[in-house]
């Protein structure tokens, strides 16, 4: 049975959850930091020990988060005005003896300074079903944190799943559309939107087919990006195409669905094939007329890739079935020359100008969300495009970003420490870092926004006894990279 929340049932359930403080803050406050963290690791016993009272919040935590069977009277009191029978008819609960247990995962979700949301998805016990619909997982959170949040007229959540990205889009887009090929995903997304009183258009179909002929200001997608043999074991992760072919086709088609200046962002995986550089592979997918920023965040060898996704699907890699599947998957990788699999974020922006295409390998961990960095990167690309001429760049006034630090390092020498290098780097965002020589470090130190870049270079040429023209030629490419990475900020 597909879940369905009528408007009246959604309103009643929302009232009950709000009254009980079954929210991200309410649950975290009840459980405490240690039990809440343990629950996130899949260790429920600390939460069971804390949420042991008869209060509505305790009952809902045990029922909806911990998988307990709760007595009819306790469930009725916690969910009122929604009755347990109505909740069961909606697909939320199932009778178990004299009590009730959850039939779906219903958990609170929210963002800083945002509304309290709830997300409906499948329970982990259903994970090995082909049409399993995942909840708020690591991939969903990664994409949400990387998405640009500027106000737009229209947004498309391509492959909406349980609706997480569409929920976020509802805060900054006037119209939100979600698509999915799986009826169960669409049903759960519809229930999520009804429960949160969010208006999202849902359309059924594969990839971009349901929105043929339409353009959007923003497209976000957490598509089935796991490269492997051509098969569909799980709709949420397997494309049915060989390797990364489906993703390549999707990326190539995105420009035709973007309005002028529209931005598409998606999580993606690409194969590292023997004898081929991964940027060349992904570059071949990119549509004409789009700026592109491709950020590789992880690289997995074949064994790690296969084992990770077997465990994600609930399959023990050491079981006979797990070994058979791994053998077939690894043999496919051997035949196709796959040496590794990259994972990251791909951002496209439709433009009428000559496109800027940049590939970055950023595997070092950082905590800051990537969304503000993507927004800043797009702005900086516009600025650099407007200052593409050397004369325009030299006339600009630039300021060193406040988070930038200069590092110098030395090595032991015959008479003590000997300077061997220096680097500048931001201490926020992705921690961009560039090695610099003496003149470059001095130039950055002089960037306070008071003088045009050209005058600073002239002063630098005098100080270092170098021809100005030669210093301009050597310096401007680095300056452009400093601007692109946000180390230098245009003034005024």
Where are these regions (language model features)?
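Long, charge-rich, low-complexity alpha-helical segments
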Residues: 56-104, 161, 175, 348, ...
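Acidic, low-complexity/disordered tracts enriched in E/D and polar residues
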Residues: 1-59, 98, 126, 353-445, ...
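A short helix-to-beta-strand connector/capping loop
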Residues: 115, 197-200, 290
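Conserved SAM/SAH cofactor-binding pocket of Class I
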Residues: 137-221, 227
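Flexible, glycine-/basic-rich loop-and-beta segments that form/coincide
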Residues: 302-378
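Mobile active-site "lid"/loop adjacent to the S-adenosyl-L-methionine
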Residues: 183-184, 221-249
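SAM-dependent Rossmann-like transferase core, predominantly class I methyltransferases
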Residues: 94-155, 162-168
